[in-house]
Each structure stands twice: as structure tokens, then as C-alpha cells.
């Protein structure tokens, strides 16, 4: 069970709505994934309606919004500050989310530049601390630097969310050692965020010790979102079970292979016995 800021979720998979090509495909993917928490950029929200049915850029005019869809499916909304590049903008966005959606949860994103979409870790830690002081439960998107991850935890983050690789690249986990180190040192949930391309990436994240995986593009931009969402659901669970089971130690060529069965009792040719028989 995944627990963040005192709230428990059966699913360890968090979905994103970015990149969805249609509301119908998004709904099918969300249902197939089994997710109970999904992140939505606050820039999708239209002021004037705090019922969760505000219009969004991903829905047809007059149709159901992403917020309405999540509400109908019983999925918790995790508003994010996607697109923000300063502490001031991120804090304002978080405040608007709390007012509009009635939640003090926020996924904090502070982007350094539009080309790489890498997080601005210098601004990130201070912003996290300010949001925590205002009563927010901050889930902080960060780099795969273990030092920054620890500083975010010290600043009060409810969860740290290191990237596997840059957003939308599908490159998987480029630095598994750092992700494993972040997990080993953390006392809050570590959620892999960004860079997942296929199910094996999600499984690896869990094997490295992550508490959960957040992904969007890998599902929403693939050829069959519902099928990929199903694959991700099973991959996260498989990785979690494998981590709990404990993998066997890896052996180098110098150490040699290790037989799974003893050589004791192995049949061998006996000349004396052969002469008697033959």
C-alpha cells in the first residue's frame, strides 16, 4: 500500500493527463491503470467553477472536463504547477488550486528551461519550504541528485519525485544508481517521475526501491493507451513484489557461474560396472 502524507492508496501507479489525444482514450487508460491519484496541470482549470467540472483544454466545448472525469471515476486530483518557472508563480498556482479544488496537495514543478524541461533545483528547495509553511503537502518533482532529494525532504516535502530522464523522452532510468541511493536515504515516499517509456522502466523503478511511479506520456502518447496502462499497472506490481522478495546477488565472470543444483549424485561412467554389465 502506498502512503503519502497520511493518505493510503492501493495502487502504486500515479497517472498524468498530459498528452492525452482524446477524453475517451484518457478515460479508458485511467480505468485500465487502476490509479487512484492523477495529476492535472492547473493551467487547465477555468475560473468560476469549483465543483470539479470546469472546462479544460483537453475536452470538447461543453463536454466533460478532466476534473469532471476524475471526479466521476473516483480518482483523487493532484494539481501541479507545470509551466511555472519562479517561486512566486508556483506558490500562486498552488494557492489557486487549494481555493478551486479544496485540496492542500500540490505537485511542485519548477522548470529551468523550456527545451530540457529539467527542474530548477536551486529555486525548488526554497519554494518547497515556503509552500510547506503555508500548510501544503508538497510532492516535489526534482532531478536524480540524492543531495537535492534529501534537502527537499528536510524542507518538509511529503514525497520526492526524481526524474528517470527528461519529461516526455521515454529514455527510461538513465541513472539507476542515483535513484536507488535516493530511495535508500529517504524517509518519505520516493516516486519516480518522468522519462518512463515502457513497462520495464516502471518495474525497474520499483525494484530500485521507489514507492510508486508517476507517468503520462508513456501511456497517453503510445499507440494503445489502455493496453499500455494495463502493462504499467502490472509492471509496477511486479517490480514491487520483486523488490520485496529480494533478488539474488549478481556475480561477475571472474566469480564464475553458480549451478542451481548440486553436482552430488550425478551419474558417471564406471569402467568396472560397465564390464560386468556388458
From Swiss-Prot:
The active site is at residue 107. Keywords: Cytoplasm, Schiff base, Thiamine biosynthesis, Transferase. The keyword Ubl conjugation does not apply. It catalyses: [ThiS sulfur-carrier protein]-C-terminal-Gly-aminoethanethioate + 2-iminoacetate + 1-deoxy-D-xylulose 5-phosphate = [ThiS sulfur-carrier protein]-C-terminal Gly-Gly + 2-[(2R,5Z)-2-carboxy-4-methylthiazol-5(2H)-ylidene]ethyl phosphate + 2 H2O + H(+). GO terms for cellular component: cytoplasm. Belongs to the ThiG family. Coiled coil: none annotated. The keyword Transcription does not apply. 1-deoxy-D-xylulose 5-phosphate binds at residues 168, 194-195, 216-217. It comes from the Bacteria. This is Thiazole synthase. Catalyzes the rearrangement of 1-deoxy-D-xylulose 5-phosphate (DXP) to produce the thiazole phosphate moiety of thiamine. Sulfur is provided by the thiocarboxylate moiety of the carrier protein ThiS. In vitro, sulfur can be provided by H(2)S. Signal peptide: none annotated. It comes from Corynebacterium urealyticum (strain ATCC 43042 / DSM 7109).
Amino acid at each position: 500500500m502506498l502512503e503519502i502524507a497520511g493518505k493510503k492508496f492501493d495502487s502504486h501507479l500515479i497517472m498524468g493527463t498530459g498528452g492525452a489525444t482524446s477524453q475517451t482514450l484518457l478515460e479508458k487508460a485511467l480505468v485500465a491503470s487502476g490509479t487512484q491519484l492523477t495529476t492535472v496541470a492547473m493551467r487547465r482549470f477555468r475560473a468560476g467553477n469549483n465543483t470539479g467540472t470546469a472546462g479544460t483544454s483537453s475536452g470538447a466545448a461543453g463536454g466533460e472536463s478532466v476534473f469532471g472525469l476524475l471526479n466521476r471515476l473516483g480518482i483523487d486530483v493532484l494539481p501541479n504547477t507545470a509551466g511555472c518557472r519562479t517561486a512566486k508563480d508556483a506558490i500562486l498556482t498552488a494557492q489557486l488550486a487549494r481555493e478551486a479544488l479544496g485540496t492542500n496537495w500540490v505537485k511542485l514543478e519548477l522548470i529551468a528551461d523550456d527545451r530540457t524541461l529539467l527542474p530548477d533545483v536551486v529555486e525548488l528547495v526554497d519554494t518547497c519550504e515556503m509552500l510547506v509553511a503555508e500548510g501544503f503537502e508538497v510532492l516535489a518533482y526534482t532531478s536524480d541528485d540524492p543531495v537535492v532529494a534529501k534537502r527537499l525532504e528536510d524542507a518538509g516535502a511529503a514525497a520526492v519525485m526524481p526524474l528517470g530522464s527528461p519529461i516526455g523522452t521515454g529514455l527510461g532510468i538513465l541513472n539507476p544508481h542515483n535513484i536507488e541511493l535516493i530511495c535508500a536515504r529517504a524517509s518519505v515516499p520516493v516516486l519516480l517521475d518522468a522519462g518512463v517509456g515502457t513497462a520495464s522502466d516502471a518495474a525497474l523503478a520499483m525494484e530500485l526501491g521507489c514507492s510508486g511511479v508517476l507517468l503520462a506520456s508513456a501511456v497517453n502518447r503510445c499507440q494503445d493507451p489502455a493496453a499500455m496502462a494495463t502493462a504499467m499497472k502490472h509492471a509496477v506490481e511486479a517490480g514491487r513484489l520483486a523488490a520485496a522478495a529480494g533478488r539474488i546477488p549478481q556475480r561477475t565472470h571472474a566469480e564464475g557461474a553458480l549451478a542451481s543444483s548440486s553436482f552430488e549424485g550425478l551419474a558417471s561412467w564406471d569402467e568396472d560396472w560397465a564390464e560386468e554389465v556388458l
